[in-house]
């Protein structure tokens, strides 16, 4: 089937390849600015939420174009590995509706709700891309240790309480997506 799969978040402002630029494992292909230190780069990346303000966002237009093109499904990145949530999650403030994100003052700042609503009205199958890794969560990438590859940066068997906190966090976010946004046909 022909469909529409969208990766979109604060990283789009800089033209970054999703959140891969903050993972040291992928430095060979991500074209990250290596003039500054990783720590400075990471801080700058996380602060992109403070300038993310997609005021021209028009979900009805997107859905109309997709329908006109003959698409049958829509999958949206609810959260990529960087942990930035494009919905009004209760689990973190690293989200589109955060008071630090200028878009939170928009009439309908929950981008996921607006997108899913527009595509559901047009009878699209709906998909939620949800990244289990969350590099912004202190229970995935702990500040106690250096960020490394794409995986948790601690030994789970030595810190089971941290992993349990992360599992609860993940469960709660998926529950929000499955219960607050209408029928979701695909979890990616």
Where are these regions (language model features)?
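Mature catalytic domains of secreted/periplasmic carbohydrate-active enzymes
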Residues: 1-188
């Amino acid at each position: 089937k022909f469909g529409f799969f969208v990766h979109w978040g604060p990283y789009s402002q800089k033209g970054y390849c999703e959140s891969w630029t903050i993972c040291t494992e992928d430095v060979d292909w991500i074209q990250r600015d290596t003039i500054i230190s990783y720590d400075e780069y990471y801080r700058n990346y996380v602060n992109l939420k403070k300038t993310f303000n997609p005021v021209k966002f028009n979900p009805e237009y997107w859905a109309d174009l997709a329908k006109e093109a003959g698409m049958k499904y829509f999958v949206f990145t609810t959260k990529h590995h960087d942990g930035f949530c494009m919905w009004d999650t209760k689990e973190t403030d690293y989200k589109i509706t955060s008071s630090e994100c200028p878009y939170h003052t928009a009439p309908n700042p929950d981008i996921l709700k607006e997108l899913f609503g527009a595509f559901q009205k047009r009878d699209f199958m709906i998909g939620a891309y949800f990244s289990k890794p969350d590099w912004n969560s202190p229970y995935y990438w702990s500040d106690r240790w250096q960020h490394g590859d794409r995986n948790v940066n601690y030994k789970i068997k030595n810190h089971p309480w941290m992993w349990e906190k992360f599992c609860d966090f993940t469960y709660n976010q998926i529950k929000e997506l499955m219960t607050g946004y209408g029928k979701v046909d695909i979890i990616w």
